[in-house]
Amino acid sequence: MNTSKTPSLPHDPNTLLITKHNGIMKTFRVIIAGSRYYCNYRKMVAKCDAILANKLSDPDCKVVIVSGCAQGADALGERYAWRHRLKVERYPADWEGLGKSAGPVRNEQMAQNADALIAFPLYGVANRGTLDMIRRAREHNLLVRVIH
């Protein structure tokens, strides 16, 4: 028996739900990240459209794409934002100033400033940065969807 005041609704687990807070527009920041070798833009569009359907169609929700400014999935995520006329928040890694720690530092900043992650790893190639992003997103209790 559901004793909460919120009614149970059927929910597609591939769709992220949002709530309206006292009639105020909510900004929903979603990181789109993945392998630098990821190049399947059609698949990305189909998956992101399905996952973000409720938010993209809700006039009270402003979706913002968070990008790590890398090649591959990150760049395609920015292209997705452009296609949907969404704002992009860019977090470039400071490779010159931070060296090898630049990627993890950037990933932590993104995880601290987002609500969700849609990750596109490619197995069979190096995915350390993507796996680090997934781990950090989970540590910060972001909604995480990993697309294989």
Where are these regions (language model features)?
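Short, Lys/Arg-enriched N-terminal segments with co-localized hydrophobic residues
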Residues: 12-24
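Acidic/glycine-enriched connector segments
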Residues: 24-27, 37-148
